[in-house]
Amino acid sequence: MDKFVSQTETSLKKKKRRWTPKGRQVEDKYLDEVSKLFSGLIFKRDELIEYLHILQDKFGVLYDKHLVALSTIINLPLSEIYEVATFYAHFNIVKDSKDYNPVNVVRVCESLTCELFGANKLLQDLKKLENKNIKVVPGPCMGRCNVAPTVCVGKNYVDVANFDKVKKTIDEKNFDPFIPDYINLSSYKKKGGYEIANKIKNGVISKKQVLDSLNESGLKGKGGAGFPTGKKWEIVSNYNGKKYVAVNGDEGEPGTFKDRSYLESDPHRFLEGALIASYFINAQKVYIYMRDEYPTVIKILLDEINKMEDEEIIPKDFFIVRRGAGAYICGEESAMIESIEGKRGLPRHRPPYVAEIGLFGCPTLTNNLETLFWVRDIIEKGPKWFAEKGSNGNKGFHSFSVSGRVKNPGVKVAPAGITIQQLIDEYCDGMADGHTFKGYLPGGASGGILPATMNDIPLDYGSKELMDAGCFLGSAAVVVLSDHDNMKDVALNLLKFFEEESCGQCTPCRSGTEKTVKLMQEKNWNKEKLKDLSEVMAQASICGLGQAATNPLNSVLKYFSNEITYD
């Protein structure tokens, strides 16, 4: 016993005392830099993603020691900051190094349309320009498919890009976003802007009149689900207590660029629609979630909202713009809510739905940006103005984002129910020279692929013919394919996108997309395994990403099987 005590005492004497706390310690230099950067701010947990943006905007990257300092200042666990920062593709976390310089990132769009126009070769060529200040990386769809291929240099876009144009942009250090001419607040008000919103606010136009107009017009959500707008507004308005409007501007579906087009030309038509929605449900605030790939749009919105506050059209901080950070999954409404709250964009299990328990645990009206864009016109001009624009028995119109092998791509406002052949011939001036129509994506990456022989299907939400074909309209992102395009490569491009953008929360999507891509990269496809994977993902995934990810695969197996060799 004495021997045991003696050994214990000896071991205790040998143990060195710790003179510093455990864990990563904040250094005064970095604490001072972060403190000065955020001087005067009242810190809120839900603004964490914006704090990370501010740090990266200032220093070019997210230094890990700055994150330690941020953790200390806002009293948030470092692990929580790291899990958020590492979730989003646009945040670049680095170890501190004396020879490390802030990086200007050159992102080459690798979406389907850009790939059709040579993005893969362009990416490899641009890699030659890399140095300690320039980093060249691939990036998902940037919402500029009508001017493919696209390259983002810093925050400045080079459209119809080639090596020389990108090199010139880098050499001239032209990294800031270009701001186009657009209808500003003064010009918008001269044309009756905000008069409808004021009439609703003051009771001159009743809520019943607003609801009747929306219902009679047949306006449906333009983000992809096609849920009746009036019904959604009514559901949220019936809840008591605090309520919010959350606008989904995370236009990440490959092939989609309509929202960007509207905001870069007529932002107040959307803002008035959002204001009307807030009056209708009696919202506390309006949160506008905008994808980080749209720096021009973000600047326009911030500038114009400041003007609205100055003219007392809205109270200060009534409209709040939140930047995303490169996560496609945040286009799903509950994932968007999580991101607005400063967390990882993981879709929530439902029920409850966000209409009941949404932003900050309150009833929340979520609308796509374009949906709100048309609200003022429908109320001002009457529901028939919108409803009668449809065709083939459908109401209203769609803003089709058309890209690919057509002569004149772009946003085409065309009747709901129009066919792809009409859209190509009457709105896009036909196929591009030297190209024969082969197939098309009616609704972006997740909407499936149809052959040119099925060119008479009405394009609208709830189109029976479209659903029977295994496809849907989604965000109305139409990509036109020709005889120059290999359908196996097309489907693989789309599945790689879903593999990259899976949030990883559920196994069917996380593992399913990875396994599907591997099987599709084989020379010969294992048809049975691919079908089994597709079925499991569709039935067991938490959200629409995993459920619809294999739609391109299913379409190729069904309509372009002659281009595939099987085991």
Model-derived regions, located:
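Gly-rich Lys/Arg/Thr-decorated short loops/hinges at beta-loop-alpha junctions or inter-strand turns
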Residues: 188-195, 247-259, 354-359, 401-406
